[in-house]
Amino acid sequence: MTVPLTQYLLVAAILFTIGVAGIILNRKNIIIILMSVELILLSVNLNLVAFSASLGDLTGQIFALFILTVAAAEAAIGLAILVTFYRNRGSIAVEDIHMMKG
């Protein structure tokens, strides 16, 4: 039993919509914004893997692995900056980020 391509695309579209809604609706918490960006990247990966499997080509799956690697590095760096910012300022509000200049 195989799952049709349209169902994969529907799940990816739902994940993408949730990620965009998370960014639009919650602009005050940087952790929620980082998680929303990760959801968007995962939806893109799901699209790549679904189309790759549908077409019988491994290129999309390999590209998805590269995107996962970059997303993991982005999350690690983002969280490290967040922890440093919280230690220095005592807040993780997006409004306070402009004080990082210099």
Swiss-Prot record:
Membrane topology category: Multi-pass membrane protein
Source taxon at top rank: Bacteria
Positions of transmembrane segments: 5-25, 30-50, 62-82
One term under GO cellular component: plasma membrane
Catalytic activity as recorded in UniProt: a quinone + NADH + 5 H(+)(in) = a quinol + NAD(+) + 4 H(+)(out)
Organism per entry: Beijerinckia indica subsp. indica (strain ATCC 9039 / DSM 1715 / NCIMB 8712)
UniProt EC number: 7.1.1.-
GO molecular function: NADH:ubiquinone reductase (non-electrogenic) activity; quinone binding
Assembly description: NDH-1 is composed of 14 different subunits. Subunits NuoA, H, J, K, L, M, N constitute the membrane sector of the complex.
GO biological process, one term: ATP synthesis coupled electron transport
Function: NDH-1 shuttles electrons from NADH, via FMN and iron-sulfur (Fe-S) centers, to quinones in the respiratory chain. The immediate electron acceptor for the enzyme in this species is believed to be ubiquinone. Couples the redox reaction to proton translocation (for every two electrons transferred, four hydrogen ions are translocated across the cytoplasmic membrane), and thus conserves the redox energy in a proton gradient.
Matches recorded under Gene3D superfamilies: 1.10.287.3510
Family: Belongs to the complex I subunit 4L family.
Subcellular localization(s) per the UniProt record: Cell inner membrane
Annotated keywords: Cell inner membrane, Cell membrane, Membrane, NAD, Quinone, Translocase, Transmembrane, Transmembrane helix, Transport, Ubiquinone
Protein name per Swiss-Prot or TrEMBL: NADH-quinone oxidoreductase subunit K
Major location (coarse): membrane
A Pfam family per the record: Oxidored_q2
